Amino acid sequence: YILENETEALILECGISFIEVKKAIDFNLQKVAGCLITHEHKDHCKAVNEVLKTSVPVYASAGTIQAMNGQGYHEPHPLEAGKVYMIGRFKVLPFHTKHDCAEPFGYLIQHEETGNVLFATDTYYLPDRFQNLSNVLIEANYRLDILERNIAEGRIPKALRDRTLKSHMSFDTCRDALLSNDLKAVNNIVLIHLSDGNSNAAEFREGIHQATGKTVHIAEKGMILNFNKTPF
């Protein structure tokens, strides 16, 4: 994921080929203020060594940095939950999330053009509450009835159920988390990290729209959205 305008950008995660990231920003690394990483699992930090060999600063929790063991020309910058950091013109507040890894973070990111952007993935619930949100990227990984049906029909092992319940956000938890936060000024809700087999994108989008009354998107490769502070 990339938050960007004509002159600056902030990369969220680096779990895909870095060449794909560079293509998305027209190979203009000079505009990138930094790369935020939530945790050390490879689908979120696979390209970290490549990023550390560029001018792009990498930011994560101390626990994530140690677990990633990234190797490059530069060292990652450790962040602390609850402290506010200026990364370029992006104001970043890391917060703790709940996942099966060292020290996972979510991020509240504020910019004059986007307003407050909530980024929360790979967490089985959202412990914090946030005010005056403008845009939201949040995990909706599975729905319990679909997961249970897949187990009953032998499509996935039962052991995966326990791991999923303790590491990823269900549709119901996602809906409840959203409704527990201040959505009055929200322009976009983007559902991310949907399980290939344990979710239903169309039903998830409609369910969150019905619950919140907001515009809801399912994240897709190449998707471009206007994350404005105001709806116009």
Each language-model region and where it sits:
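Conserved beta-strand hairpin/beta-sheet module of binuclear metal-dependent hydrolase folds
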Residues: 1-27, 105-122, 134-135, 144
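Divalent metal-coordination and catalytic microenvironments
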Residues: 3, 39, 92, 99, ...
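Active-site metal-binding loops of divalent metal-dependent hydrolases
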Residues: 14-16, 40, 97-100, 121-123, ...
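Active-site metal-binding motif and surrounding structural segment of the metallo-beta-lactamase
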Residues: 17-63
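Active-site environment of divalent metal-dependent phosphoester hydrolases
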Residues: 40-46, 65-67, 101-102, 126-128, ...
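Metal-dependent catalytic neighborhoods of phosphoester/phosphodiester hydrolases
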Residues: 46-55, 70-71, 199-207
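Metallo-beta-lactamase
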Residues: 61-114
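Cap/insert and terminal regions of metallo-dependent hydrolase folds
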Residues: 131-222
